[in-house]
UniProtKB/Swiss-Prot annotation:
<dbReference type="GO" id="GO:0008270">
    <property type="term" value="F:zinc ion binding"/>
</dbReference>
<comment type="subunit">
    <text>Homotrimer.</text>
</comment>
<dbReference type="InterPro" id="IPR004013">
    <property type="entry name" value="PHP_dom"/>
</dbReference>
<keyword id="KW-0378">Hydrolase</keyword>
<feature type="binding site">
    <location>
        <position position="73"/>
    </location>
    <ligand>
        <name>Zn(2+) 1</name>
    </ligand>
</feature>
<dbReference type="GO" id="GO:0005829">
    <property type="term" value="C:cytosol"/>
</dbReference>
<feature type="binding site">
    <location>
        <position position="194"/>
    </location>
    <ligand>
        <name>Zn(2+) 2</name>
    </ligand>
</feature>
<dbReference type="Pfam" id="PF02811">
    <property type="entry name" value="PHP"/>
</dbReference>
<feature type="binding site">
    <location>
        <position position="7"/>
    </location>
    <ligand>
        <name>Zn(2+) 1</name>
    </ligand>
</feature>
<keyword id="KW-0479">Metal-binding</keyword>
<feature type="binding site">
    <location>
        <position position="73"/>
    </location>
    <ligand>
        <name>Zn(2+) 3</name>
    </ligand>
</feature>
<feature type="binding site">
    <location>
        <position position="40"/>
    </location>
    <ligand>
        <name>Zn(2+) 2</name>
    </ligand>
</feature>
<comment type="similarity">
    <text>Belongs to the PHP family.</text>
</comment>
<feature type="binding site">
    <location>
        <position position="101"/>
    </location>
    <ligand>
        <name>Zn(2+) 3</name>
    </ligand>
</feature>
<dbReference type="GO" id="GO:0016791">
    <property type="term" value="F:phosphatase activity"/>
</dbReference>
<dbReference type="InterPro" id="IPR050243">
    <property type="entry name" value="PHP_phosphatase"/>
</dbReference>
<dbReference type="InterPro" id="IPR023710">
    <property type="entry name" value="Phosphatase_YcdX_put"/>
</dbReference>
Length: 245
């Protein structure tokens, strides 16, 4: 098990069922040292209000030895790469994930999807692209991976894509991993937990990475320090409370 999980949802996204406290308890039990809460951006129908994200600044940084990153899974809104995270939201958040979700951006042809994803990557506003292997949104894996390397953005391998959602993702996720490997980029693993019980579960992701001989040194979840170095390279100020994670 890796000690970092970068994608999960709380009861603030009303189709999820666990609280921040639930995730902290599970993290302690499972040996997770650092995790990010990434509830859906406000353009989703059941997502939190934007004030929810702004007020995440009141969260403690560390509880019982577990570090907590303040994040969002924003929605890609259009081909210009706009997302539903802006203004004061950025000031309160550590981690910006963004991806396609049908209620906000309907599936298009491969060229349009690729244009939208690359524009999002190039915007400088996101750290990770969520579930880029979704078969509902065909993309040019090579072009997206090369753009991600250029702009220091990681592509996610999402464990839930093989279990509960986005059926048929396996071949695409293998292609994503291979393209990132060839481009020399980063992958981020996300459990995409909607209950705390599945946080830190990456078994299906690891099968994909093993299948393409993906280099472990390019996986962000290997250690808290690796992930924090990545975020700091993107401009995040060092967080003193995380120094001993």
């Amino acid at each position: 098990m890796y000690p970092v999980d970068l994608h999960m949802h709380t009861v603030a996204s009303t189709h999820a069922y666990s609280t921040l406290s639930d995730y902290i308890a599970q993290a302690k039990q499972k040996g997770i040292k650092l995790f990010a809460i990434t509830d859906h951006g406000p353009d989703m129908e059941d997502a939190p209000h934007h004030w929810h994200f702004i007020n995440m600044r009141i969260w403690p940084r560390v509880v019982d030895g577990v570090g907590i990153l303040r994040g969002i899974e924003a929605n890609i809104k259009n081909v210009d790469g706009e997302i539903d995270c802006s203004g004061k939201m950025f000031d309160s958040l550590d981690l910006i994930i963004a991806g396609f979700h049908e209620p906000v951006f309907a599936p298009h042809d491969k060229a349009t999807n690729t244009k939208a994803m690359i524009a999002t990557i190039a915007s400088g506003n996101v750290h990770i692209i969520s579930h880029p292997g979704n078969p509902r949104y065909p993309i040019d894996f090579k072009a997206v991976s090369e753009a991600a390397v250029k702009h220091q953005v990681a592509l996610e391998i999402n464990n839930s894509s093989f279990l509960h959602s986005r059926k048929g993702s396996e071949d695409n996720c293998r292609a994503v991993a291979a393209a990132v490997r060839d481009a020399g980029g980063w992958v981020a693993l996300g459990s995409d937990s909607h209950t705390a019980f599945t946080m830190g579960e990456f078994e299906e992701c690891l099968k994909i990475l093993d299948a393409v001989d993906f280099p472990p040194e390019r996986i962000l979840n290997v250690s808290p320090r690796r992930l924090l170095n990545f975020l700091e390279s993107r401009g995040m100020a060092p967080i003193a409370e995380f120094a001993d994670l």
